[in-house]
Regions:
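Surface-exposed, interaction-prone regions used to assemble/regulate multi-protein complexes
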Residues: 1-242
Length: 242
């Protein structure tokens, strides 16, 4: 892929780190009592999102929510440690506080500059692809190609049949009217990420001789980022695979 690579995907994730970030002087150092206080506040907010704010702590739903919240914080800590550069990581006093969007003012300034840089990178890449697509699409059948947009959609099935390749998707708000795509007279060029259970992230479309080439970035069920490439004569869309 030339535009929407794994680096682009990571830039997208990194660009959002400062979305709910709060300047907090007390987050400049790690204090267990203060972290417990922020943890309690954040967990209450999480329960409100689940409509469990009035439930007893011992109810199964709240116990499950607590486990889920801990897992979310732990997962976000891992993501932050992967995305943030060394010059920012070394200034993090408490990773769990940061994962709950509390950081010292100095650290917040660093992170906001980093996020802004990633947003600019995303914009440059998006504009470059848009420029390519604007020129290329004069040769595309737009009524067909414009329907390919399965961003963040789960691929539930991949079925080869008589030279074609079928994809089934879980319904999603952005494209709930399409739950299946048929790639007619399909050749698989690269199959690394061609896995049922993967999440479709981004695609690039090209015309190679008399076929459309679809390059797709996916997230595999284990969280790894991969891609696949296929060429097809045309694409057909419908509500389900039959």
């Amino acid at each position: 892929m030339k535009y929407f690579t794994e680096q682009y995907y990571k830039a997208c994730l990194a660009s959002a780190i400062d979305g709910a970030l709060q300047d907090d002087v007390r987050a400049a150092k790690s204090e267990q009592a203060y972290k417990d206080q922020i943890w309690s506040q954040s967990f209450r907010a999480f329960l409100e999102q689940l409509d469990l704010s009035g439930a007893e702590e011992t109810t199964p739903a709240v116990v499950q929510a607590k486990e889920q919240f801990r897992a979310l914080v732990s997962s976000y800590v891992e993501q932050l440690q992967e995305l943030l550069p060394d010059n920012i990581r070394k200034n993090v006093a408490d990773w769990e506080l940061l994962a709950m969007n509390h950081a010292s003012p100095a650290l917040c300034r660093q992170i906001r500059r980093f996020c802004a840089s990633n947003r600019r990178q995303m914009q440059r890449i998006s504009r470059a692809y848009e420029s390519y697509y604007k020129k290329a699409c004069v040769h595309f059948k737009l009524d067909m190609i414009s329907q390919i947009g399965f961003h963040d959609c789960l691929i539930t099935e991949i079925v080869p049949q008589l030279g074609d390749l079928f994809f089934a998707f879980a319904a999603a708000p952005a494209h709930s009217y399409i739950t299946a795509m048929r790639c007619v007279k399909c050749d698989v060029i690269k199959d690394d990420g061609l896995k049922a259970g993967a999440t479709w992230l981004y695609e690039e479309v090209y015309l190679v001789e008399d076929k459309y080439e679809l390059q797709v970035l996916v997230q595999l069920p284990n969280g790894a980022i991969s891609d696949f490439v296929l060429q097809a004569q045309r694409f057909e869309f419908r509500g389900s695979i039959t």
